[in-house]
Amino acid sequence: MTERLKLTGLVLRAVDYGESDRVVTLLTRERGKVSGFARGARASRRRFGGALEPFTLLVAEARERPGSDMLGLESVSVLRAHGGIRGELARIACAGYAAELSRELVRDHEPHAELLALLLEYLGALDAGPARPEGLRAFELGALRAAGLMPRVDACVACGGALGPEGRVRFDPGQGGVLCPPCAPAAAPGAPWVSIAAASALARLQAEGLAGASAALPPSVGREARDALAAFLEHHLGRRLAARRFLDEVGPLLGD
């Protein structure tokens, strides 16, 4: 008999399997990102109820399955459902994007307390209030920090020189951040120019985190910050996330 495990985690993804089963991806405190197989989850609500839904924080009892990396889920109890998120399309889009980004940034079976705490903080904010682009930028920056991929936006990534009070700089994902005008010719082809205001906004959100996301950014600055981080993430992930495409479609709903 395999050892019974007790895990506290957040549901990042849930996929129906066959006629009655469900496969979930959890970000857990104890084992990091894991996959779990819930036999009969859709046929009977006795063991799992409605707990195996994205964004749910839960405690799961599970066992390792011989010959498989996937855990067998036996029962779960909900700690926080984040039900407020599901009542508004913009909040669903932001939460889904945050969950997919978290899933892509970490490897299986590696505990990642910093990212889990950040994701719970962000989902808690979405559960309690409206989705805002500044919060999403703060989450992206925090997730990149947790994954060791934080871009340099407070100074030139090449020479370390301070950025001027105004003007524009190049944002080069391959080099890891902004390039001042003298270093800008070394940027990769297609690396965008961004305003000092956008770079400064990203630096502030990087330093203050979600707590600093209450101050609204001017629309043009917000768009530059969004596009710069989107390019950075695509460069490092190697693709555009599916949830990002959905988020772009509902962007006007949150002013993004």
Swiss-Prot record:
Q: Which PANTHER family match?
A: DNA REPAIR PROTEIN RECO
A Pfam family hit: RecO_C
This chain belongs to the protein called: DNA repair protein RecO
Record keyword Signal present: no
Regarding protein family, the annotation reads: Belongs to the RecO family.
Q: Which UniProt keywords apply?
A: DNA damage, DNA recombination, DNA repair
List, in alphabetical order, the GO biological process terms annotated in this UniProt record: DNA recombination; double-strand break repair
Gene that specifies this protein: recO
Q: What does this protein do?
A: Involved in DNA repair and RecF pathway recombination.
What GO cellular component entries does it have? bacterial nucleoid
Under Gene3D superfamilies, the record lists: Nucleic acid-binding proteins, Recombination protein O, C-terminal domain
